């Protein structure tokens, strides 16, 4: 998909508004146009990402896997348009369609995936590796609410949920077919069969790690890398036996506990429950990531013997240290 003119950009935006929102340009508001713009650019990056991954596999290039509990990505619309070389085209197309480009760019929320210096460092590394044509992937958790929005009420700070995915979710490409299963609790049984050691978890609680990919465009290159974000879901969304008995809250308890893992970045840990949740987040994130990396390596090479030759795992901080 190539968009090299204002007309092509306008046509693409109008088509996205129609098929994704059932809206015309005249009916669309700034939020819808922001999401339509993001979807158009995401389509371009998705095609380039497929080409990048195919080249990496065919050339058997070594890949960097960058793990961080946070990625402070900021706003992506203007950055991606600039990196893809369509910044002026998008700006002019929006203006000609009756929107102020500055308002559209400003309406995008910051992705609630990071907080401070560590998150910004991770985002910069990922941008730089992409610009340098280095095959790389970032990994983190797809936090539903980020940290919080701050409001001052009667001179006091009030923390409110940051629903960044309402608009920012346009950049996320769900990949449910690549879901991994993370096990918590239970016991482990080991046994030998046909000369091989088998390790079987028993009595565990399963949580599904569902990947949502965010494409990362490099500047002045067709190379596109991926930030893989793990969402947490329960394989059993509802206990029908409890629900049928009127135990509505208990029926959803397992589902709610699973989703808590990906609810917020850095939950308060000044109580035992908070400490437990942070540890669950770290284990969930690392387990899903390693399973994904190993699975993809085996699919390409058929063996783990050369894993160290084709993969480099880098951690940004101590939170994903379990990967070691």
What do these predicted regions represent?
Residues 1-324:
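A conserved ligand/cofactor-binding region detector
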């Amino acid at each position: 998909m190539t968009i090299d003119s204002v007309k092509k950009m306008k046509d693409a935006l109008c088509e996205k508004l129609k098929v994704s929102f059932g809206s015309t340009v005249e009916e669309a508001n700034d939020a819808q146009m922001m999401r339509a713009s993001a979807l158009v650019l995401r389509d371009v990056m998705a095609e380039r990402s497929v080409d990048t991954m195919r080249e990496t596999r065919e050339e058997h290039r070594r890949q960097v896997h960058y793990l961080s509990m946070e990625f402070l990505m900021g706003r992506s619309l203007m950055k991606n348009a600039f990196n893809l070389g369509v910044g002026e085209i998008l700006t002019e197309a929006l203006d000609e369609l009756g929107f102020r480009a500055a308002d559209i760019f400003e309406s995008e929320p910051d992705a609630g995936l990071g907080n401070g210096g560590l998150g910004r460092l991770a985002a910069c590394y990922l941008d730089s590796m992409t610009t340098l044509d280095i095959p790389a992937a970032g990994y983190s958790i797809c936090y539903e609410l980020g940290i919080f929005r701050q409001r001052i009420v009667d001179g006091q700070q009030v923390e409110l949920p940051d629903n960044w995915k309402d608009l920012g979710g346009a950049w996320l490409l769900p990949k449910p077919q690549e879901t991994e299963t993370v096990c918590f609790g239970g016991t482990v049984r080991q046994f030998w069969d046909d000369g091989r050691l088998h390790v079987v978890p028993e009595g565990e609680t399963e949580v599904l790690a569902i990947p949502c990919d965010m494409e990362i465009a490099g500047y002045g290159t067709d190379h596109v890398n991926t930030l893989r974000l793990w969402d947490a879901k329960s394989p059993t969304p509802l206990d029908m036996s409890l629900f049928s008995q009127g135990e509505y809250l208990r029926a959803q308890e397992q589902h709610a506990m699973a989703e808590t893992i990906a609810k917020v970045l850095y939950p308060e840990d000044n109580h035992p429950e908070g400490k437990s949740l942070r540890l669950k987040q770290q284990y969930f994130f690392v387990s899903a990531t390693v399973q994904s990396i190993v699975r993809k390596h085996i699919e390409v090479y058929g063996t783990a013997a050369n894993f160290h030759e084709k993969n480099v795992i880098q951690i940004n901080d101590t939170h994903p240290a379990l990967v070691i």
